Amino acid sequence: MTAVIEAHGLGKRYRGRWALTECTLSIPAGRVVGLVGPNGAGKSTLLNLACGQLHPTAGTIRVLGHRPGDGPGQLARVGFVAQDTPVYAGLSVADHLRFGARTNPAWDHEAAYRRIEQLGLDPRQKAGRLSGGQRAQLALTLAAAKQPELLLLDEPVAALDPLARRSFLHSLTEFAGEREGRTIVLSSHVITDLERVCDYLLLISGSRVRLAGPCEELIAEHYRIVGPRRAASALPAGMAVVQENHIDHRSAFIVRTAAPLPKGDWRVERLDLEDLVLAYLVRDTRSHDSYDAHDSHDLEGPQ
């Protein structure tokens, strides 16, 4: 399948600190991608590189087969909603739509006004007087009405209340289904939001890509296995240990494997997306701490 975003050895450095390093990835078309990771992991940096607002310090990135931001034609194919869902406080809702129509050649005027009507927004209302949820919806409307092939969303629901967040995600799902092959990348800390709308996961931690792939496939490859205390070396061959925890006479491992699962005195448990994400994030955090303490095997994990 054609890659919408493809990066090789991508890196970005700010004042001597690498915000993103050695990032290699390939995101296929037609996916709703959940971009997840801790604060400072490099998620916003990656999105800003993808839309052309930043330029790489190292490596390469191609978006829709071209360099990001490479001319008006390329810009028209990508929509971006930044973290603070920026709108112009002094302009009305209608002003925003007129501005969008003048600056985007593929602008869908009817769809934009229809969406504003469905949301119950007054076209005469100044954006500065809208609620946080309404501003987020307006920003999504502007990005969607330009009919992009790729839509990038940098934590657009972070400051919204549960009802506003639910409404925004519902709108996002509708937008994703309107056109075959459209790709959305949604950055969020709320894993339940990603479970609701995303079918592809991209996990960044420590400024590097740690996990990427279709959600269903990743979940199917990971398990928690619990049994009598033993070392990871006692596990069957072909199991990659993501996380391990030992308490008293019991051991628990989160593993990634396509090999047959252990039988006998092992208990095997399925993971959901939240379990999976947290396992990798905890592993990276604990591995870093353990490295500093010269003990990389005492990892705390879920029971």
Q: What role is predicted for each listed range?
A:
Residues 58-74:
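Conserved ABC transporter NBD signature motif
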Residues 83-138:
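ABC-family P-loop ATPase nucleotide-binding domains
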Residues 5, 20-22:
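Conserved structural motif at the start of ABC-family nucleotide-binding domains
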Residues 167-255:
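ABC transporter nucleotide-binding domain
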Residues 36-38:
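The feature captures the beta-strand-to-loop junction immediately N-terminal to the Walker
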Residues 151-155, 160:
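Catalytic Walker B motif of ABC-type/P-loop ATPase nucleotide-binding domains
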Residues 51:
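Helix-to-loop junction immediately C-terminal to a conserved catalytic motif
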